[in-house]
């Protein structure tokens, strides 16, 4: 266990809450102490929902541990069933309750309830939120469909041709607290409808128990979010013979590949290769003269597996960026992320330590960071522009407007979101030319982040660099001014090299001449 002020994922029972809150007619009884009852804020504040999550807490206290906590579980299960009348009941325990080994799921299953009871065993000390969401959705699908499992798991995705109807697919994986899931579903539905493909079931987002039972009626499954749906799609493929698509349609190239994959599986004529150029503005923008300032921009990418992989492809193939860092906190997605990083000549960063991510970001010296809410904070400290591409996210990353990431419109949104933090070419030149004029205020809000400043500096001042003993270094005002003329994305590296050079030669005061000497030294 690690003590930290930030975590990329919550414990697995938060993933279970996401599934329960995403569905209709499902209630979750969570065996948990008072301190674990914080879920309401996640959904009402961050997700901007008007409804509280369908969760009942047993809220045991320290004095209850000397008595019969099993009876406490049963009482809360009865009360939840009587009050909410759910179509299906999820029963599990929080990370703290796991320690007392009450097995609430088994207790609930032995109560003779009329609705399906799904017992969740989510190891809180070895797994995390996305795994918990995937396991919960998998257990829901498995428990509700096990009686429909055919003896022969042969499934023909071209059955629609013989039945004289349009092909039908399911969209699996979208959930609450996912990144733009609501908007992605609408965009993918629109995309498929334009190609003559109907959408049968969307799950877990907005689905009920009866909807899950209709999953086998479709011709194939679309795995929109592998972190949540891949295990369920694999089970449906093994037991029902239902194939599923593996391409996540984020970006122009991936959207085209997704359509080709789905059309091939359904036995349909694939779409035209130039459809992306006709329906999305991203290809035209990225090839226009105005976007030449994007070419070669250094980008650091970190997020969940699906969005990090999609961002790496868009940056390298569609926008002409240079990817200088790629990583994920999703250990379940480590293998494909490592493969993508290797193809880009990089070593993937697989970590859930935000400090390690910040250190890697500083070392890579990018011009743009694509990451989570935490990377936005880290990038601001480093003075680097940032766009959020993945959960965990802030409420400001859940816009009221339609803002998908998938499909043709998603590609347009991505172009805007990623380019807006960057300074345009002319703006960059003007700021470089006039930065030292007295009218220019460093503290002005800009796309580079809120680094602040104090306008004109006192040229007689010295800047102290904390160090041990007699090794303290001092930057003079003219040295700092010269350093500011260096592009921000390599400024940190130049500062470190100059300080290392100054220590090597025994120089305690760093001025512009020291900076030039260090530059010559490292170029030699």
From Swiss-Prot:
Active-site residue numbers: 290 (proton donor)
Gene3D superfamilies named in the record: 1.20.89.20, Nitrogenase molybdenum iron protein domain (3.40.50.1980), Proto-chlorophyllide reductase 57 kD subunit B (1.10.8.550)
Function comment: Component of the dark-operative protochlorophyllide reductase (DPOR) that uses Mg-ATP and reduced ferredoxin to reduce ring D of protochlorophyllide (Pchlide) to form chlorophyllide a (Chlide). This reaction is light-independent. The NB-protein (ChlN-ChlB) is the catalytic component of the complex.
Subunit structure: Protochlorophyllide reductase is composed of three subunits; ChlL, ChlN and ChlB. Forms a heterotetramer of two ChlB and two ChlN subunits.
This protein's pathway: Porphyrin-containing compound metabolism; chlorophyll biosynthesis (light-independent)
Name of the gene: chlB
Chain segments annotated as transmembrane: none
Keyword annotations: 4Fe-4S, ATP-binding, Chlorophyll biosynthesis, Iron, Iron-sulfur, Metal-binding, Nucleotide-binding, Oxidoreductase, Photosynthesis
Domain of life of the native organism: Bacteria
Organism (species): Synechococcus sp. (strain CC9605)
Free-text comment on the cofactor: Binds 1 [4Fe-4S] cluster per heterodimer. The cluster is bound at the heterodimer interface by residues from both subunits.
Gene Ontology terms: biological process: light-independent chlorophyll biosynthetic process; photosynthesis, dark reaction
Entry GO MF terms: 4 iron, 4 sulfur cluster binding; ATP binding; metal ion binding; oxidoreductase activity, acting on iron-sulfur proteins as donors; oxidoreductase activity, acting on the CH-CH group of donors, iron-sulfur protein as acceptor
Amino-acid positions noted as binding substrate in the UniProt annotation, renumbered to this chain: 425-426
Top EC class of this enzyme: oxidoreductase
Its EC number(s): 1.3.7.7
InterPro entries attached to this UniProt entry: ChlB/BchB/BchZ, LI-POR_suB-like_C, Nase/OxRdtase_comp1, P-CP_red_C, Protochl_reductB, Protochlorophyllide_Rdtase
Protein family membership: Belongs to the ChlB/BchB/BchZ family.
Annotated protein name in UniProt: Light-independent protochlorophyllide reductase subunit B
Pfam entry (one): PCP_red
Sites where the protein binds [4Fe-4S] cluster: 36
Reactions accelerated catalytically: chlorophyllide a + oxidized 2[4Fe-4S]-[ferredoxin] + 2 ADP + 2 phosphate = protochlorophyllide a + reduced 2[4Fe-4S]-[ferredoxin] + 2 ATP + 2 H2O
């Amino acid at each position: 266990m690690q003590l930290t002020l930030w975590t990329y994922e919550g414990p697995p029972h938060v993933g279970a809450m996401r599934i329960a809150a995403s569905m209709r007619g499902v209630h979750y009884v969570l065996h948990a102490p008072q301190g674990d009852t914080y879920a309401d804020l996640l959904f009402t504040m961050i997700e901007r929902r008007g409804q509280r999550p369908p969760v009942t807490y047993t809220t045991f206290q320290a004095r209850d541990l000397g008595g019969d906590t099993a009876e406490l579980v049963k009482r809360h299960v009865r009360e939840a069933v009587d009050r909410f009348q759910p179509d299906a009941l999820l029963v599990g325990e929080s990370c703290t309750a796991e320690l007392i080994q009450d097995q609430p799921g088994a207790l609930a299953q032995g109560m003779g309830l009329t609705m399906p009871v799904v017992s969740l065993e989510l190891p809180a000390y070895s797994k995390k939120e996305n795994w918990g969401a995937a396991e919960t959705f998998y257990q829901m699908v498995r428990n509700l469909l096990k009686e429909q499992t055919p003896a022969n798991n042969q499934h023909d995705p071209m059955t629609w041709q013989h039945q004289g109807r349009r092909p039908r697919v399911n969209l699996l994986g979208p959930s609450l607290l996912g990144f733009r899931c609501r908007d992605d579903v609408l965009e993918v539905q629109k995309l498929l409808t334009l190609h003559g493909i109907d959408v049968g079931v969307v799950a877990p987002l907005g689905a009920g128990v009866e909807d899950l039972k209709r999953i086998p009626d479709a011709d194939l499954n679309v795995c929109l979010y592998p972190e949540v749906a891949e295990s369920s799609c694999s089970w449906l493929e093994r037991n029902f013979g239902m194939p599923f698509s593996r391409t996540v349609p984020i970006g122009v190239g991936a959207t085209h590949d997704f359509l080709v994959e789905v059309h091939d599986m359904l036995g349909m004529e694939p779409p035209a290769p130039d459809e992306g150029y006709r329906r999305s503005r991203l290809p035209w923008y990225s090839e226009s003269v105005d976007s030449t300032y994007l070419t070669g921009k250094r980008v650091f990418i970190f997020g969940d597996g699906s969005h990090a992989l999609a961002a790496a492809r868009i940056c390298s193939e569609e926008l002409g960026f240079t990817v200088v860092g790629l990583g994920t906190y999703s250990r379940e997605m480590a293998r494909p992320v490592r493969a993508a990083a290797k193809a880009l000549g990089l070593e993937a960063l697989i970590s859930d330590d935000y400090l390690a991510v910040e250190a890697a970001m500083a070392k890579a010296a990018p011009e743009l960071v694509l990451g989570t809410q935490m990377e936005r904070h880290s990038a601001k400290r480093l003075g680097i522009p940032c766009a959020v591409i993945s959960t965990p996210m802030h409420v400001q990353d859940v816009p009221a407007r339609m803002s998908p990431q998938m499909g043709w419109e998603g590609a347009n949104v991505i172009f805007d979101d990623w380019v807006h933090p960057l300074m345009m070419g002319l703006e960059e030149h003007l700021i470089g030319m006039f930065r030292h004029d007295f009218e220019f205020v460093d503290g002005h809000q800009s796309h580079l982040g809120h680094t602040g400043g104090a306008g004109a500096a006192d040229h007689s001042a010295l800047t102290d660099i904390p160090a041990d003993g007699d090794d303290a270094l001092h930057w003079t005002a003219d040295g700092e001014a010269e350093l500011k003329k260096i592009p921000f994305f390599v400024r940190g590296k130049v500062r470190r090299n100059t300080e290392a050079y100054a220590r090597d030669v025994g120089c305690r005061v760093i001025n512009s001449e020291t900076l030039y000497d260090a530059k010559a030294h490292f170029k030699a």
